[in-house]
Regions:
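Enriched for short, Lys/Arg-rich terminal
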Residues: 1-24, 39, 55-59, 64-86
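Detector for the c-type heme attachment site
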Residues: 27
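A short, surface-exposed loop/turn module that caps and links secondary-structure elements
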Residues: 30-54
Length: 86
């Protein structure tokens, strides 16, 4: 069972600002999330419903999961020190 991945505009904007090596690392992680969005190491964010955090090196991926539609919405991508301020 594979999930469809979609991106919010701000996530795409942040991805475009990152170095190519970081983007490759993040996209590899997102690809693995499409097969299992609840894999080991994933944490649910407190205070949000169905919003999770994945690590990709020093970067964080915040995403929502809709199991009914098999959809993962990438909400925010960024450096770990900045991503939670958005």
């Amino acid at each position: 069972m594979s999930y469809t991945v979609q991106y919010e505009k701000r996530a795409l904007k942040e991805l475009s600002k990152l170095p190519a090596t970081a983007v490759r690392q993040i996209l590899t992680k997102i690809d693995s999330l499409s097969t299992d969005p609840y894999q080991t190491g994933i944490k649910k964010l407190k205070g949000f419903e169905n919003v999770f955090r994945a690590r990709a090196g020093n970067y964080r991926i915040l995403y929502e999961v809709n199991d009914g539609k098999l959809l993962i919405m990438i909400v925010v991508v960024g450096d770990r020190k900045d991503v939670y301020d958005q």
